[in-house]
Swiss-Prot record:
Expressed in stems. Belongs to the MEG family. The keyword Disulfide bond applies. Keywords: Disulfide bond, Signal. It comes from the Eukaryota. The keyword Chaperone does not apply. Disulfide bonds join C44-C59, C49-C78, C57-C74, C60-C67. This is EMBRYO SURROUNDING FACTOR 1-like protein 11. Residues 1-23 form the signal peptide.
Length: 88
């Protein structure tokens, strides 16, 4: 048979393990949310211009093509021509 002091120690350990497990679950959720990395993928790629031998144009990746020497202009037009799909 278990003595009362052994039973008390067992109960303290059991309660401590439950509290530790609850803490780890909360900590794990925080770490999961903090580890979500957002990667920006430009809608434009560098390509060779039709009028040049160098890769100095930026063209849309999507269905509708547009090329520009300026990356900002390309991104703006590509997002207008090929809007990103909504996330599920």
């Amino acid at each position: 048979m278990i003595s009362s002091s052994h039973f008390a120690i067992f109960c303290i350990i059991l309660v401590s393990l439950f509290a530790l497990q609850q803490y780890e679950i909360g900590n794990m959720e925080e770490n999961l949310n903090a580890s979500k990395i957002v990667v920006y993928l430009s809608p434009c790629v560098r390509k060779r211009c039709s009028f040049s031998l160098f890769k100095n144009c930026h063209c849309c990746r999507g269905k509708y093509h547009f090329c520009s020497k300026n990356i900002k202009v390309c991104e703006k037009e590509c997002l207008r021509l090929n809007p990103p799909r909504p996330l599920p």
